[in-house]
UniProtKB/Swiss-Prot annotation:
Keywords: Disulfide bond, Knottin, Secreted, Signal, Toxin
Gene source species: Lycosa singoriensis
Residues in the signal sequence: 1-20
Name this protein carries in UniProt: U1-lycotoxin-Ls1y
UniProt note: domains: The presence of a 'disulfide through disulfide knot' structurally defines this protein as a knottin.
Tissue specificity note: Expressed by the venom gland.
Length: 107
């Protein structure tokens, strides 16, 4: 039963990864958009860096693109501001854990 769960989780992860790759391929149909995409990859926001002003500019991790995660911060004056950072969502962390575990088991 445990092997079946690991295989199913691995398949779901691989399908998610391949679909995210397919979306990236669709965005780069023309040469100009491909060149612009390469330029944005060089200028993307790394993990754990602030993305408040550019919420779609996070870099790509080993399997998935990082997501801009926001939180509301209350200053000492009582003023609320939104602060965002690039990070890995929990379900992506779980998928990466399953893939890493699968690599250790199956080599």
């Amino acid at each position: 039963m445990m092997k079946v769960l690991v295989v199913v989780a691995l398949l779901v992860t691989l399908i998610s990864y391949s679909s995210s790759e397919g979306i990236d391929d669709l965005e780069a149909d023309e040469l100009l958009s491909l060149m612009a995409n390469e330029q944005t990859r060089k200028e993307c926001i790394p993990k754990h860096h602030e993305c408040t002003s550019n919420k779609h500019g996070c870099c790509r991790g080993s399997f998935f693109k990082y997501r801009c995660q926001c939180t509301t911060v209350v200053t000492q004056d009582g003023e609320q501001t939104e602060r965002c950072f690039c990070g890995t969502p929990p379900h992506h962390k779980a998928a990466e854990l399953v893939v890493g575990f699968g690599k250790k088991i199956f080599g």
